Amino acid sequence: MTDYDILFVDDELRILQAFERQLRKRFSIRTAESAQEALKILEVDGPCAVIVSDMWMPGMDGIKLLTQVKNLYPNTVQIMLTAHTDQKTAIDAVNCGQIFKFLTKPIGPEALTSLLDSAIREYRLITAEKELLSQTLKGSVNVL
């Protein structure tokens, strides 16, 4: 199992349970049944490496959720997974939510596992780049 948390957000409990069942041996999985619950989990438990959100949920849609997550936790890699797609939804998700991947349901376990491996690699790159930049800045300040 990886040390990186992945948060799945979907208003359909059976989908969350299926993801957890398929992936729990390999990944550290957290789940939320709404965008509001996801934000609360992140507030209490801290950021996760990857968030996978459904698009259409009551209260707050996935684009709004991922936009807030990006503002609060810029290192978190974001994935949109939805059964209902149209061009405007995809464009809004990419432009507003700055997502890593936009995928449609259903998605097979092998494809999902591969996607999550890629997302964790992206998270590692983001955090390593920021750490390197921080160390470079500290070194520059010390030289001055």
Q: What spans do the regions from the language model cover?
A:
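Two-component/phosphorelay signaling modules centered on CheY-like receiver
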Residues: 4, 13-31
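Acidic/His-rich, divalent-metal-binding segments that scaffold phosphate/diphosphate chemistry
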Residues: 115-144
